[in-house]
Amino acid sequence: SGLLQSGMKKGDRVLLMVPYGTKFVTLAFALFKAGAVPVLIDPGMGKKNVLHCIKQSEPRGIIAIPLAHAIKTLTPSAFKSIQLSVTVGRKWFWSGPTLDQVKRNGQTDYQMGETLEDESAAVLFTSGSTGPAKGVLYTHGMFNQQTRVLREHFGILPGKKDLPTFP
């Protein structure tokens, strides 16, 4: 709810640029819960390709570490669609709250908003290994179907838990 109180809205594309780990996973699920659409780009594809992907995806928001915000400041043309910024860590001279400020403004009893099967869920970029990287728009229905297939294939029963993650 802190993200929504910071100005993000359901359906907003939000670029997530934090190192993979607990914070990355937590923030991705927080964006899903807020109804925002995470934009996930592999930084290993190189600066030029990453900047092209950012420009192509036209995110309205960014949640990122200070280095990514510094790059945003130095290459504004790739980030011109950004209206809302959240810094994970120490904030320098750019606008927007820190993640700690967003957390303090949130409600602990926030309920997830309803999403429809055909609504945008995430934009995931291909690696670019066979040509230019391309953003693939996933819907909630696509993710739900993937979950159903995994549940059936691996025999995951009600009450059991599993957490598949990115490789």
Predicted segments with their positions:
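Internal alpha/beta domain cores that form substrate/cofactor-binding pockets in large enzymes
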Residues: L15, F32, P38-D42, G46, ...
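Structural detector for helix-capping/boundary residues
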Residues: S6, D12, K48, L99-D100, ...
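Conserved pre-ATP/AMP-binding loop-to-beta segment of ANL
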Residues: K103-F125, G131-P132, G155-D162
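ANL superfamily adenylate-forming
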Residues: L67-E117
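Conserved ATP-dependent adenylate/AMP-binding module captured primarily in the ANL superfamily
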Residues: G2-Q5, M45-P76, Q146-L163
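Conserved AMP-binding A3 loop
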Residues: A121-R148
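Conserved AMP-binding/adenylate-forming
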Residues: G2-M45, K161-P167
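Short acidic/polar active-site loop segments enriched in Thr and Asp
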Residues: K9, R60, Q83
